[in-house]
Regions:
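Conserved long alpha-helical elements within nucleotide-processing catalytic cores of c-di-GMP signaling
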Residues: 2-9, 16-46, 52-64, 68-76, ...
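Catalytic-core segments of nucleotide cyclases and related cyclic-nucleotide turnover enzymes
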Residues: 27, 72, 90, 105-131, ...
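C-di-GMP signaling machinery
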Residues: 125-170
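Catalytic strand-loop-helix junctions within cyclic-nucleotide turnover domains
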Residues: 62-71, 90-93, 98-115, 140-145, ...
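Short, intrinsically disordered, charge-balanced linker/junction segments flanking boundaries
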Residues: 2-5, 29, 171-174, 178-183
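Short beta-strand edge/capping elements of PAS-family sensory modules
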Residues: 7, 113-114, 132, 182-183
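Amphipathic alpha-helical regulatory segments at dimerization interfaces
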Residues: 40, 44, 77, 81-85, ...
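Catalytic core regions of nucleotide second-messenger enzymes
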Residues: 53, 69-73, 82-98, 127, ...
Length: 183
């Protein structure tokens, strides 16, 4: 930021229902959907804004010189644009949505890794709250993401136990001084 107190925004977008299209119709359909959504998003951004694909079905948009209230308007207009978009593939028509995390970038932010993580957490919260919505980053979003990730692991471990996919190994602990097994 060149001006003191200048605010920018990062939008972290994650397409809803992309996996269904990709799995149902194949990677060709998924790739075409990504191309069309990219063109759609790009058509609504200002020349000074930056759109980038972050991976999979995730995009980042840097809104330069854009305070949070304006960024929220842009995010909602992008969300509505994607929501109203119809993707045609062969004889099928799909509707998709987009979950968007919004993070305000100021001069005193903690660096790129923090900004990306915060925007990702906000996006995760938007998805967790019901998808196809915009969520402005809150400090407790990181905790929600960690807790949900922990719950996901707990569920996976419990399923592995139920499926008898785990086996236990042990190694006795022996004192070096007298070679006796510790209890």
């Amino acid at each position: 930021s060149t001006r003191k107190n200048d605010t920018h925004a990062l939008l972290y977008l994650d397409l809803d229902q992309f996996k269904i299209i990709n799995d149902t119709c194949g990677h060709g359909a998924g790739d075409e959907l990504l191309r069309q959504v990219t063109a759609l998003l790009h058509s609504k951004l200002r020349a000074r804004d930056t759109l980038a694909r972050l991976g999979g079905d995730e995009f980042g948009v840097v809104l330069e010189h854009c305070p949070q209230n304006e960024a929220m308007q842009v995010a909602n207009s992008l969300r509505e644009l994607v929501q109203n978009f119809r993707f045609q593939w062969l004889d099928k028509t799909f509707t998709i949505g987009v979950s968007i995390g919004l993070y305000s970038i100021r001069q005193d932010n903690e660096g790129l890794a923090h900004v990306m993580s915060a925007a990702d957490s906000a996006c995760y919260t938007a998805k967790n709250e019901g998808r196809n919505r915009v969520h402005i980053y809150q400090a407790n979003d990181n905790e929600l993401q960690k807790k949900s990730s922990g719950m996901e692991w707990l569920s996976r471990i419990q399923q592995a136990i139920a499926d008898k996919r785990l086996c236990l190994y042990f190694q006795p602990i022996i004192a070096l001084s007298n070679k006796n097994e510790l209890e």
